[in-house]
Amino acid sequence: MMARLALHPAEQRRLAEDPSVIPRAVEEMLRWETPVTSVVRVTTQDTELSGCPIAADEVVSVILGSANTDERAWVEAESVDIDRRVNKHLAFGGGVHRCLGSHLARMELRVVLEEWHARIPEYRVPEGVELDVSPSLRQIADLPLVW
């Protein structure tokens, strides 16, 4: 989330100038930068998905990041809109398997963005630095910033 904002100064300014946008921005960036990109499940019954039969007791990988950018579910799915009003993303899973810590994580993200942007409204990744993002768990090992 901080890496994305460091690369998008207009969004940084929005959050610094209008902190009321932060809760929506958190949800949108969770949709876009889904922290856990996939989960493994076992089917409980025979089913079919998009014409593909899946037998009971099959192991399937659910790609949450893909679901969160599905154009059938999202208007302008391939763009980030921190003003997006309806945002029922799957960044924390869903149903009985939903992350128990999702409410705490959201609160932590809101507080971090509020406090950071109140103190450091402008920041960026230094020129020439390439960010190394882990593909399975959306994380960056090192995020150098200048402000």
Task: Map each language-model feature to its residues.
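Cytochrome P450
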Residues: M1-W147
